[in-house]
From Swiss-Prot:
The gene is nuoK. It comes from Musicola paradisiaca (strain Ech703) (Dickeya paradisiaca). The keyword Cell inner membrane applies. Pfam families: Oxidored_q2. Coiled coil: none annotated. This is NADH-quinone oxidoreductase subunit K. Keywords: Cell inner membrane, Cell membrane, Membrane, NAD, Quinone, Translocase, Transmembrane, Transmembrane helix, Transport, Ubiquinone. NDH-1 is composed of 13 different subunits. Subunits NuoA, H, J, K, L, M, N constitute the membrane sector of the complex. The chain crosses the membrane at residues 4-24, 28-48, 60-80. GO terms for biological process: ATP synthesis coupled electron transport. Its EC number is 7.1.1.-. Belongs to the complex I subunit 4L family. It is found in: Cell inner membrane.
């Protein structure tokens, strides 16, 4: 069994890597991938904590987080596809220029 500190440290490292990718990257697809990494890191923390205390609540929260991540990914990819068809780019700087 993995110690609680090691599992939570791994989850924290993954979360920080996802947050760094979200802040640094300018491509919307990579930003969506970074967001998925952050969601999976938080789900990993739930599983590690549930395993440590012998509760199945962590696994239930993991299933909920994966369901949320799948819904977010499908909606995000559909929006990115439409955006790419209209603007021919996924660069956040180009997309943020609004007409009005």
């Amino acid at each position: 069994m993995i110690p609680l500190q090691h599992g939570l440290l791994l989850a924290a490292i993954l979360f920080v890597l996802g947050l760094t990718g979200l802040v640094i990257r300018r491509n919307l697809l990579f930003m969506l991938i970074s967001l998925e990494i952050m969601i999976n890191a938080s789900a990993l923390a739930f599983v590690v904590a549930g395993s440590y205390w012998g509760q199945s609540d962590g696994q239930v929260m993991y299933i909920l987080a994966i369901t949320l991540a799948a819904a977010e990914a499908s909606i995000g990819l559909a929006l990115l596809l439409q955006l790419y068809r209209r603007r021919q780019t996924l660069n956040i700087d180009t997309v943020s220029e609004m007409r009005g």
